[in-house]
Amino acid sequence: MNVMKYMLVAMVVLLASCSRSTTDYAEEDYDLLFPFAGIEKPKVSYEDQIVQQGNPDAPVSDFVYPGVEINTNVRTYNLTLTCQFREVDILGNNVPDDDLASRFVVRYVAANRQLITIASNTTNEEAAQYLTNGKPLELHFKAQSGFPMYLLVNGVGPRGSSIKATISAVSEDGFTIVKPLTVNEHQNEEGMDKIKGPFCAYIILP
């Protein structure tokens, strides 16, 4: 009888030790512990000098200044634009001005943030300057960090004509090297035709 009593007591103790706790814990407010801070915007580093593409066929009226405001570590740059077109006859000689057929355009953003057109043909009413056949044109101006070093080259010409342009920037502090934008296009098809590689791109100066 005593053995049965001890076995019964042992079973009661064992069951009590294995029973789960029924204590209720306070529900955590995870919104308070981990508040949503919104989607983090990607950080853009203009030090990377990413070449951003534009539309070489867009009209001047569609232009929107693509520069940005940079307020720290602002640098000043000396920009240089050089461009030249050439139209030759079957002997390789420059075509006289009165017989020129090329209609090339070079566009850049000037220091006043306006899109400026340079043209090979004097009938282009949008042009601020005109190119002379076979002679390079060189322009210089200053700009600061956040300015778009911009170059557009497009147009049509007869076989054997060509258009080339380069824009570059050198920082006055001497420490920042900006890769230039360069175009060199030749029209080699019969008759009048568009250049094969119209170009429009810019780099935000870091």
Q: Residue locations for each model-derived region?
A:
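Exposed low-complexity, polar/acidic, P/S/T/G-rich flexible segments that act as propeptides
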Residues: R103-Y108, R159-D173
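Sec-dependent bacterial lipoprotein signal peptides
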Residues: M1-S19
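Short, low-complexity, Pro/Ser/Thr/Gly-rich segments in the mature regions of secreted, periplasmic
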Residues: M192-P206
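Tryptophan-paired
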Residues: A110-A143
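Acidic/polar, low-complexity intrinsically disordered N-terminal segments immediately downstream
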Residues: C18-A110, P206
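Low-complexity, repetitive regions of proteins mediating host interaction that are extracellular
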Residues: N2-K5, G38-P42, C200
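Short, solvent-exposed aromatic-acidic interface loops
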Residues: V156, K179-K194
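Hydrophobic beta-strand segments within beta-rich accessory/binding domains
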Residues: N78-N93, H140, Q144-G157
